[in-house]
Amino acid sequence: MSTESGPGTRLRNLPVMGDGLETSQMSTTQAQAQPQPANAASTNPPPPETSNPNKPKRQTNQLQYLLRVVLKTLWKHQFAWPFQQPVDAVKLNLPDYYKIIKTPMDMGTIKKRLENNYYWNAQECIQDFNTMFTNCYIYNKPGDDIVLMAEALEKLFLQKINELPTEETEIMIVQAKGRGRGRKETGAAKPGVSTVPNTTQASTSPQTQTPQQNPPPPVQATTHPFPAVTPDLIAQPPVMTMVPPQPLQTPSPVPPQPPPPPAPVPQPVQSHPPIIATTPQPVKTKKGVKRKADTTTPTTIDPIHEPPSLAPEPKTAKLGPRRESSRPVKPPKKDVPDSQQHPGPEKSSKISEQLKCCSGILKEMFAKKHAAYAWPFYKPVDVEALGLHDYCDIIKHPMDMSTIKSKLESREYRDAQEFGADVRLMFSNCYKYNPPDHEVVAMARKLQDVFEMRFAKMPDEPEEPVVTVSSPAVPPPTKVVAPPSSSDSSSDSSSDSDSSTDDSEEERAQRLAELQEQLKAVHEQLAALSQPQQNKPKKKEKDKKEKKKEKHKKKEEVEENKKSKTKELPPKKTKKNNSSNSNVSKKEPVPTKTKPPPTYESEEEDKCKPMSYEEKRQLSLDINKLPGEKLGRVVHIIQSREPSLKNSNPDEIEIDFETLKPSTLRELERYVTSCLRKKRKPQAEKVDVIAGSSKMKGFSSSESESTSESSSSDSEDSETEMAPKSKKKGHTGRDQKKHHHHHHPQMQPAPAPVPQQPPPPPQQPPPPPPPQQQQQQPPPPPPPPSMPQQTAPAMKSSPPPFITAQVPVLEPQLPGSVFDPIGHFTQPILHLPQPELPPHLPQPPEHSTPPHLNQHAVVSPPALHNALPQQPSRPSNRAAALPPKPTRPPAVSPALAQPPLLPQPPMAQPPQVLLEDEEPPAPPLTSMQMQLYLQQLQKVQPPTPLLPSVKVQSQPPPPLPPPPHPSVQQQQLQPQPPPPPPPQPQPPPQQQHQPPPRPVHLPSMPFSAHIQQPPPPPGQQPTHPPPGQQPPPPQPAKPQQVIQHHPSPRHHKSDPYSAGHLREAPSPLMIHSPQMPQFQSLTHQSPPQQNVQPKKQVKGRAEPQPPGPVMGQGQGCPPASPAAVPMLSQELRPPSVVQPQPLVVVKEEKIHSPIIRSEPFSTSLRPEPPKHPENIKAPVHLPQRPEMKPVDIGRPVIRPPEQSAPPPGAPDKDKQKQEPKTPVAPKKDLKIKNMGSWASLVQKHPTTPSSTAKSSSDSFEHFRRAAREKEEREKALKAQAEHAEKEKERLRQERMRSREDEDALEQARRAHEEARRRQEQQQQQQQQRQEQQQQQQQAAAVAAASAPQAQSSQPQSMLDQQRELARKREQERRRREAMAATIDMNFQSDLLSIFEENLF
């Protein structure tokens, strides 16, 4: 009674009850726990009896489950405290409680009855629970807190009862005496008193044993009065034999329950029998140990979760040794009771948080929800029963969950790593022994997913693998013994888990809280990653031979351990890169080209700068482009680097770029770009494997990613996935680009002063080829190029460093001359101003130094092409287009690099002629384009991509002045020279005559080549220095720049623009607007030449003109100088090696833009260009609406720049033409050119050479007309073919109709003839029939003949008038259809758009 009052007082004090509800709560508590009859106004009735010596005792598997699972779970519930002891009506001041409640009941009484084997069957126990809840509902009001608490408990109770074993089987009771003794020891003199202590003990024991499953129930407070019992319970797992725990646990054998550990006392009892059936005390000890697992001894499934100890008790003697070995501490495996008692104290000592989590993980693996696929791993493999005679030979270290549980409870694991190693060893054994498609392997994968998910949530990141196989030696013996009895192993595992949980109550409470948090996290993860299993299985299958522990440790911990190593390694690698890149490498550390150590996170994180939103967006788009077979590697990269996603399902992984580490994003970027490069490389690298491949990679990456992202990703990708290739290609391609720049500056250190001198320009003709050769040569200097490999942003920001590193001397010139040759070659792209001024200065030196190179370039166009494509990769936006040019000869690379723009649709129609003409020249273009690409890359690489493009365009304008024309021609020749060395010699003289123009033409060639300016910067810089030449080129350059800059979206298109060869469909617009402006400028400078060229181009438009015009106009070289124009026209007609390059440009454009195909070339070549600068932007875009969209975007952008920076664009351009002081003006022109380059070009051309403008416009119109006619013809032919087919079908139908009509007529005739002359009619009918048949056959033949002739007249008139009428009808129908079909609205709209464009 006193004890009861104590609990009652606690109840009042507990905060769970509301203030106003204390009485009701107390009453509820009393009602629930009412052990005493309703005697109590002043005194409480005696509690219900918990034992009856006269009543036979009985233990069943269901009762065991009720004790170990149901009662244990309810006892630990936070609302259980009011029901843990009989209602104390005196303390709670409930005088009427026992009057209303005649059969009081509480969980404390139920627990004692279960422990004392009081119930005969489970129904009696369930009835007591129902009585307890009913009493609460009867006595208390519906809304009271105590009622709500009872409802919550009842709900949980019903859930657990649903899992009750279906069949009730009796279990031997070996512990009756022990239990009685235990009670006596505990001193249960009074039933009431004994009930309270039992309750407290039970509550404490469950807390200690199963802290993980449930939070410590409030009952713990009540249980404190019996601290002596709690220590016993804590010690119980090991010391289960101890008497004090036994009294509490004596009744526990009845309920076995694996899932909830709340009923620790009963479980120990059950677990004991399996371990030691002979000795009652040992059984008790084991009860405490195996609370959970022993619950379902009778059922096979239950034993898996929690093997029932009571049911196997008879078998326990056999299994005892094995079980004991698994359960007890290593030393006393067989002496379970004693050894467990001793280990008990050890276990009572604090277990590390990680090991506590391990115990929780193991319990979850034993849970019923996983039983469907976990059951094969519950017990050691029974080699004899399964007939697996070779198992022990293959599997040297068997392992199973029961063995792991016993080792965990016996404290054999020093840390979580050993535990994880054994679990993974168990799975790896399964994967090793069984075939991959075996169902057991699938089950192991599922279970391992559960394990890994929980193991990853370990509090202190204990996942660091400590590949420790300490357990294997022990597990094999246990396994060998274990196979005989499954129930024993299950019971052992349950007892082990219970014992592992047995610690001080405080530890339990902490554990429970932690475990709940972990469970929540795990559930959230499971929900998010619905299928993480497949990923793990794949890894495990791969590493079947390797132990799971080792593998995971390597993956998880090795990464962390290697992080420090990687920090050290990256410097070494960077050193290598620096050595390879020399000057450039220093800047690359930021991109961190950690090719070998992509796996090292710390290193990469240190080096990898975070991705911008644009980069992440581009990366997402690129990942979506990858083929299915490449996505597995993406998932692997993410999972290997992101601990939170390690257990995610690879098939349904969800990637949030915001949560991924920078190193992971960069690694993904490298991989994706490398994959995309591989797709495009085959074509791009056909010409130049080393340089081309890296540049193509860069190009593809730039296409897919922003400029900065593409460059960084390129470097990273080459480093990570293609360490060798990245070194070669990265250095050769990217680095070659920069190296070429560097080498050019170095080659041009002397030319640097020349930039402003006109003489250097004459020398420039040779330099363009040398740039190409230099590009070829740069591959050898890839070491320095590693720096260029840096991201495009790095390139932009680091151009000065590159310049300084490569040509310190040249750098000074840069400041002085606005652009130093070094700047151009090294990072001319970085400095927009450089391209304008220094392009001219450096170009002469380059050309002068590389005249030989020019010849070499001709010889080695493929290598140059490779270099060029690589260069484009750097100036992610503009260089990308250029790379396609070099690749273009292969025809594959263009598709790879530029297909994104709009190349594909246009390629369909006009490209045929262009391709025919241009493809042969493609190789020459490659050499020229190599040079141009290097230059363009350099220019494009300048700090701002837009500026680089402007530079390119600004330089192309220089051709506008007459002096530039020769230079332009020379440049064209130079590009051509690669195929024919003789043409190169010609360009040099022209350049000499007009040094500034030549540089200008080089820029325009870059323009056509899409930014040959980078080459012109070295070679052109001298050209720009000539004031007369430079001002005009900037204007043409403006359109190009505009296009190129705006093309940032059409990144690649802009390149095609500048270099029509670039195989980019967008080129049509580009050709018209950029090339046209340049051409116009050229035309103005040399009207006769332009006129000649446009005419020639018009004549040879189909073949030479496309290439030539594109080259000439796009580059501005041919039109630029009078000599150049004739050269272009001549070369265009005979797609000579020199011409091929221009042809390539045109080809690209034509192919890409169907509408512009025929006309764009002529337009670009003709005086129309002036119109195109402004008008063509829209008109050209209109024809190529799909393809031109990028161009349209670019052009609008171009116009604003022109307006903003070049409002004085026209005057500036004119000034540039007149003044050689383009160094400073070009910068302004860069923007102005973008804005008013087209307008200024249009104005310039009309102002300077009106005759040329007219001639060009005339030729352009002719070209348009020819193109229109050609298109109309093609459409007409198509329509005719379609009509013919339709007519054939009609004829067939008509034949059928005519036959029917004839039959009807024949019948009518027959009737009339029969009336007149039956005989004659019959004869006539026969004849008619024969005739009709013949006629039908004839008609069919005629129809067949006429069907092919869709538009031809209908078959000859039929004998029948009706037939003739029908045929006439059909003919009319056909005519109508033919007329309707001839009118193609799409075709008409295209024609109108072309016409409107021409009007401008």
From Swiss-Prot:
The modification Phosphoserine is found at residues 471, 485, 489, 493, 495, 499-500, 504, 602, 1153, 1162, 1237, 1240. GO terms for biological process: chromatin organization; chromosome segregation; inner cell mass cell proliferation; positive regulation of canonical NF-kappaB signal transduction; positive regulation of DNA-templated transcription; positive regulation of G2/M transition of mitotic cell cycle; positive regulation of T-helper 17 cell lineage commitment; positive regulation of transcription by RNA polymerase II. Gene3D superfamilies: 1.20.1270.220, Bromodomain-like. The record marks 140, 434 as: Acetylated histone binding. Residues 23-43, 197-212, 479-498, 700-713, 928-938, 1085-1095, 1247-1258, 1321-1357 have a biased composition (Low complexity). Its main location: nucleus. The NET domain mediates interaction with a number of chromatin proteins involved in transcription regulation (NSD3, JMJD6, CHD4, GLTSCR1 and ATAD5). This is Bromodomain-containing protein 4. The gene is Brd4.
